[in-house]
Curated annotation (Swiss-Prot):
Because the Archaea possessing a type III RuBisCO are all anaerobic, it is most likely that only the carboxylase activity of RuBisCO, and not the competitive oxygenase activity (by which RuBP reacts with O(2) to form one molecule of 3-phosphoglycerate and one molecule of 2-phosphoglycolate), is biologically relevant in these strains. One of its GO terms (molecular function) is magnesium ion binding. Binds 1 Mg(2+) ion per subunit. Keywords: Carbon dioxide fixation, Lyase, Magnesium, Metal-binding, Oxidoreductase. Substrate binds at K157, R274, H306, S343, G344, G345, Q365, A366, G367, G368. Mg(2+) binds at K181, D183, E184. Homodimer or homodecamer. In contrast to form I RuBisCO, the form III RuBisCO is composed solely of large subunits. This is Ribulose bisphosphate carboxylase. The gene is rbcL. Its EC number is 4.1.1.39. Gene3D superfamilies: Ribulose bisphosphate carboxylase, large subunit, C-terminal domain, RuBisCO large subunit, N-terminal domain. InterPro entries: RuBisCO, RuBisCO_III, RuBisCO_lsu_C, RuBisCO_lsu_C_sf, RuBisCO_lsu_fd_N, RuBisCO_lsu_N_sf.
Amino acid sequence: MKVEWYLDFVDLDYTPGRDELIVEYYFEPNGVSPEEAAGRIASESSIGTWTTLWKMPEMAKRSMAKVFYLEKSGEGYIAKIAYPLTLFEEGSIVQLLSAIAGNIFGMKALKNLRLLDFHPPYEYLRHFKGPQYGVKGIREFMGVKERPLTATVPKPKMGWSVDEYAEIAYELWSGGIDLLKDDENFTSFPFNRFEERVKKLYRIRDIVEAETEERKEYLINITGSVDVMEKRAELVANEGGQYVMIDIIVTGWSALQYMREVTEDLGLAIHAHRAMHAAFTRNPKHGITMYAIAKLARMIGVDQIHTGTAVGKMAGDYEEVKRINDFLLSKWEHIREVFPVASGGLHPGLMPELIRLFGKDLVIQAGGGVMGHPDGPRAGAKALRDAIDAALEGVDLEEKAKSSPELKKALDKWGYLKPK
């Protein structure tokens, strides 16, 4: 009598239909054949249990996932699995992940498992809104048509009082920074309450906009429980802000989907910080790729998301970051494009290479590379803007520095250093 049925989920001659969701996995079997391991993934992520059953509903039979591709790759294998849409609730990222990234990661029959990519058909994708603004919308409300947007986190990222933070914000915005940004763990504290900060910072922003005749914005961190985030978003909108920042991984997908609806009602763009992503994206053999995370975030509707730099201090090589950025900026049915954010170890000397690698549709966030300028944050901001202008004009930084003392001092300090 047949007991296990994992191979029933493997059909390498199967051709997926246009209305099926395709998922690509890397896996390493543990004590079972590659075919059985792949079948176990397909079974557990669709309708399966470990054994044959007394009765099988007709709908369940039609909902069986199918492994249709299996090839050796390094120490493991690449499998492609087709999932009928009957397995998925419309418009629910959390239900999708409970299937394709759920129990399968705990199976003993696998040494390693990594979700590489997924391809939703339009019939599934149409239930997601994507970004409210996207690249085009953000460029319009910021009034920046061609160059990369600039952003800075006041460093150190903790410890500022509201008044101190406001003073730094004034200097940074006045020096040419477009977007002031809170860091991932900077929310609300006895020494710097969110409610006080939001009011003070937007007053400063209005002053700088009048003085510089440039649009300025504040990526204020509203991360918290859902009820707290909603209240904070309302405060931002009431003060005339047009952005909020959310730590999307620690906040969770369900909360992010809810806040996408809230921010649309309030007219707010979402800046997505990816803190904690490396817990499951960094190991090349196990977890979920940052590419897949970026795709999920775009479906839900963030307007910009951190992707890496390839030249800074954070993990992520050029090919990985380039692939993510290219996807975020590509046409994808009705889903708007998303601004990639380069951050982590950036300074003026790296601008020509960064822009050469990734182009001008980019948010360039430099924290220490602005705040660490010998003459202070305003000079650091101007040095960054001058370096970006030089890169776009095709002018060598050393040549540009002859007319920019701020850039010269930045180059004297950091040169073209790539932080480790």
